[in-house]
């Protein structure tokens, strides 16, 4: 029974990963084609293509890691594969967090109806900063990755040189990561999460007040403008829930509370990667350009299926 449940969650994780890879790849391809055609991208499209690319690679790395580890646990636990995976995973995860934060800030400055002078100044200046913020996010993520590697590698090497058994090496690796890294990861990940949280809450509050004001002025719930604001609110709340779930999952995952030997490992991996698999679809359906191309592909697929 336990083996059947494990197989079920592995299959569910695989399907979720395929959906995430396909959706993020779709965003990158559509906006990449736009970039090649016109030679430039709007600030929103810059963030979306960066976020899609980082999520695509992160989902791919995470999927390969999970299945390689489950198949080659002995070699992976005692070899350099663990280092290789963590090096890429930390970089991509940090970049993804920052890109999500800048996306929320851009949404906030473009949509929120706030009249404070500082916000109005930021509303005017922020779009021009987007390319530099994205480049800075990549640089910060690279530095953070080197920091983790610098702290991590000597400790692993010391235990490997002592020729511990594979099981002993795995236990020491887990202990090192459990005792030294969660607090560091919490501090590093909390910075973009705080930026995201402030921006998204300001935007949700602004949209909520605007929707209430429209209803108070006689607009019905069926009014197109009211429906548009309601859809935007639902989209932002979904983004907030998924991002918060991803943040909490990664913090708990950093404590190694649920290891590969745990019965809940695969359900937990589903929770960890849920945001980067589901949120791309929210972005696709809420973006006119992406939704239009996606609808065309669905029509082509339907015509091919009927034919």
Swiss-Prot record:
GO terms for cellular component: plasma membrane. The keyword Transferase does not apply. One of its GO terms (molecular function) is bitter taste receptor activity. Residues 29-40, 110-129, 205-234, 286-307 are cytoplasmic. Disulfide bonds: none annotated. InterPro entries: TAS2R (IPR007960). Glycans are attached at residue 167. It is found in: Membrane. Residues 1-7, 62-88, 151-183, 256-264 are extracellular. It is a multi-pass membrane protein. Keywords: G-protein coupled receptor, Glycoprotein, Membrane, Receptor, Sensory transduction, Taste, Transducer, Transmembrane, Transmembrane helix. It comes from the Eukaryota. The keyword Membrane applies. The chain crosses the membrane at residues 8-28, 41-61, 89-109, 130-150, 184-204, 235-255, 265-285. Belongs to the G-protein coupled receptor T2R family. Most taste cells may be activated by a limited number of bitter compounds; individual taste cells can discriminate among bitter stimuli. Receptor that may play a role in the perception of bitterness and is gustducin-linked. May play a role in sensing the chemical composition of the gastrointestinal content. The activity of this receptor may stimulate alpha gustducin, mediate PLC-beta-2 activation and lead to the gating of TRPM5. PANTHER family: TASTE RECEPTOR TYPE 2, TASTE RECEPTOR TYPE 2 MEMBER 41. This is Taste receptor type 2 member 41.
